């Protein structure tokens, strides 16, 4: 059981590292076009990105 938990933790940490690097590149722009990075660095989202995220949220609720 402990082994499974540690493997999952490593996967999550690796994803965070990759995401952080990608988001730092995205943060240099005035608006960012990938939703998670916008939350990560507090940038305003591109209008298309916001619309796509809203559509995805509405789609999941149905």
UniProtKB/Swiss-Prot annotation:
Q: Where is the signal peptide?
A: 1-22
Q: Is Signal there in the keyword field?
A: yes
Q: Please report the propeptide residues according to the UniProt annotation.
A: 23-49
This protein's UniProt keywords: Disulfide bond, Neurotoxin, Secreted, Signal, Toxin
Function text = Probable neurotoxin.
Can you name the source organism?
Conus imperialis
Q: Name one GO molecular function term.
A: toxin activity
- What's the protein called, per UniProt? Conotoxin Im11.9
Similarity annotation = Belongs to the conotoxin I2 superfamily.
Q: Which domain of life is it from?
A: Eukaryota
């Amino acid at each position: 059981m402990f082994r499974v938990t540690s493997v999952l933790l490593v996967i999550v940490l690796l994803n965070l590292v990759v995401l952080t690097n990608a988001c730092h590149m995205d943060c240099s722009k005035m608006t960012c076009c990938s939703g998670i990075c916008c939350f990560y660095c507090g940038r305003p989202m591109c209008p298309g990105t916001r619309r796509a995220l809203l559509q995805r949220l509405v789609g999941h609720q149905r």
